[in-house]
Design a protein with these regions (language model features):
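Conserved class I S-adenosyl-L-methionine
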Residues: 66-75
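A short acidic, Gly/Pro-enriched loop at the edge of an enzyme's catalytic core
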Residues: 124-132
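A short glycine-rich, Lys/Arg-flanked "PGG" loop and its adjoining helix->strand segment in the class I
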Residues: 149-166
Length: 172
């Protein structure tokens, strides 16, 4: 079973899609997809967060079962499940607890998943990762990073988290 780690959670969610996230959580807990709903009930956030098409962003990449992946900005888990199917272990970081709860509900059966809730800048990891995946959050990350040159600081931090020769991917 996946692990939901709240050690770095400050009880403050910094962003949200609003009340639709409660609907998304309920859908995830019930194992439902937006495809199960009548068309008039489907909204953009449902499709955005739950469409299997989003996995295509990295499904082609030849991850191996020996690989460890750090997923930064995991959101509601749009690509988390795919990463878990391909890699040996996935550590997903999400700033919003509600989104992490949705990700957990979607992927709770994954034995190789740890979801960490909180600001990446506050976290420490006992190991480095073979791959660091930044999926559509780089443009927001600067809002949660202090410093004069936050983009450079963020890129440097990602590099420190990956093994020597590790790969960093920023996909939108």
């Amino acid at each position: 079973m996946a692990e939901l780690n709240l050690d770095y959670y400050t009880a403050k969610d910094h962003y949200s899609d609003g009340d639709i996230e409660e609907t998304l959580l309920k859908m995830a807990q019930e194992g439902k997809s937006f495809e199960d709903l009548p068309e008039e009930e489907v909204s953009f956030p449902m499709v955005y967060h739950f469409s299997g098409l989003r996995e295509n962003i990295l499904s082609w990449y030849p991850l191996k079962k020996a690989d460890s992946v750090l997923e930064i900005g995991a959101g509601c888990g749009a690509i988390t499940g795919m990463l878990c199917r391909k890699a040996g272990h996935v550590t997903s970081v999400e700033l919003s607890k509600r989104r992490a709860d949705i990700n957990y509900a979607r992927n709770r059966d994954k034995e190789n998943l740890t979801i960490m809730v909180g600001n990446l800048n506050d976290m420490t990891f006992p190991e480095k990762f073979d791959y660091v995946v930044v999926n559509g959050v780089l443009e927001y990350a600067m809002s949660f990073t202090e410093g004069k040159n936050s983009l450079r600081d963020i890129s440097s931090a990602y590099g420190r988290l990956s093994e020597a020769g590790g790969k960093t991917s920023d996909r939108h």
